[in-house]
């Protein structure tokens, strides 16, 4: 038995983890896997590379596989409520409120929401000129209202013109008009709901006693279909549409609703695409899990992990699909229609496929947001809310929708707000805590001062800059802000090369602020030395196939340097990385920790160097007012006057980082000599630091006398107990 199997993970999944050399679960996996397998919503935060992907992929794969197996064996959905193939005359799993649950047989509704009303309609309605009846029994205390409504009516029964309800407080309601009617009812009472379409009357009974006509239907609703409906607030009701004997038979020509023939009944259009179908299986394009990633690289990374994990899962086969831009839509559509159970995708392509009806959300059981803070910062809050609203909160086999959120910063206001709004009593798994720099990372700052270092004035092959100062009067001898800003850009290219040479960097990730900066540095390094400075770029303006190939080349160590932006590199797990260079500090202090955390993993030593300008640097900042959003933009005015530039103040950003980490970051000069404060004075970046122990052996020796004394006391106490037992 593998360590993962002790959490209840399938042996087939355990074999896959074993083959990946995952001997023991990481902390986040040990916490999250049992919680997800147990059916709960989970919020988890841990560093990139800590196994977050496995923490949600393994349990989701297991539950999806078990559901498919039960479908094949016919174990699930007895009572006709699996996979959207609902038997006529049950309460709908789809046409209902967010916090209302429907049992697998479709005949009992429950809502435990104290503050809001949540409603539900039946899967089938009646029409024509007949007289129809159903019973609703109050099975738990709470507030409830039951009756009839059209398909266009508000789920909050009785609050619009097309809903007619009778509530437990003894009030009838239509169009928000609440009038005294009959008498109050409560737990164990049986309410009969009568609809006379011939005379266009709605009436109710309580425990067999007719309470009289409650409503007369307006003529404009004469041709409408009416569905049994209920709305609950912390209450529960059981329904009988006539499949079994009524407790109080209606008489007077009324028949059970389920006895309405085809000419007098109509299926609820919101019951789902497979409603009434003979097959219990969901549609091939109705996945059970949706995993949203902020970038195509992360989506590919997660998809590849799922493919590895499910290698030994068979009979039935779990099919996963990657939905990202840059791939032909027809190709993805063809794969989707072959049957898909887990979808991993980026927001843009997911939205396109869902809005066009190619991906159905009717059977979605898991909604996963990976790197949620990045998704929210990219402006996908509205999309996430909309998708969550579309996904049924109770699946067709009676299981509750599970939401899993992974974020580097769980305590960010936006993430907290989203969790409160969308998640159901989530468990917080925060193994990250406050931002801190790992002991295995040396991080230093190299100040770039164009007033002290004037070598920028005589560079033979300077780096190409972003063009911010193309129309400014910048030249040596002119000490204007613009000239010093341009000098910073030139010096940073030189300092980057010098850092590479000084530390013989053969593998590093280099962060630039913008896509244009990445392109400029890539050209500069290639001009300086071919193979010696071999590099590739990773950012949103590169074609998807190129981005994929560039990342693979860097992972396979075919090139030495990966130049990228924060967004493109978010969440990428690149192992054994010894060096990282910040050409420009990030404007978000938490991103500094994310960047330098890419080195020094798996107990291997890493060096992070940040180039920080001592003077303000003028940089591009394309806001919503920029029509091209940066493409061929030449508006170098400041944003205060609707321009596309700002003055970037790195000393202030450095102060924010130091305050955030509560440390003073060590500074080095342009020679890039990094002081080593290790025990033996030697560090090889990228190799394990053998002296990072915690003194555990000494600690054991200190505890030996105490443990020995404890053993003696335990022996004495048990001996005393046995002696007294004999007496």
Curated annotation (Swiss-Prot):
Lineage of the species this protein comes from: Eukaryota, Metazoa, Ecdysozoa, Arthropoda, Hexapoda
General function of this protein: Acts as an ATP-dependent RNA helicase, able to unwind both RNA-RNA and RNA-DNA duplexes. Possesses 5' single-stranded RNA overhang nuclease activity.
Entry EC number(s): 3.6.4.13
GO biological process: double-strand break repair; embryonic development via the syncytial blastoderm; oogenesis; spermatogenesis; tRNA processing
Segments forming domain Helicase C-terminal: 483-676
Domain B30.2/SPRY: 69-246
Enzyme class: hydrolase
Gene name in the database record: Ddx1
MF (Gene Ontology): ATP binding; ATP hydrolysis activity; chromatin binding; DNA/RNA helicase activity; exonuclease activity; nuclease activity; poly(A) binding; RNA helicase activity
Keywords from the UniProt entry: ATP-binding, Exonuclease, Helicase, Hydrolase, Nuclease, Nucleotide-binding, RNA-binding
Location of the motif DEAD box: 370-373
Pfam families: DEAD, Helicase_C, SPRY
Any single Gene Ontology cellular-component annotation: nucleus
Stated family: Belongs to the DEAD box helicase family. DDX1 subfamily.
Name of the protein: ATP-dependent RNA helicase Ddx1
Stored InterPro entries: B30.2/SPRY, B30.2/SPRY_sf, ConA-like_dom_sf, DEAD/DEAH_box_helicase_dom, Helicase_ATP-bd, Helicase_C-like, P-loop_NTPase, SPRY_dom
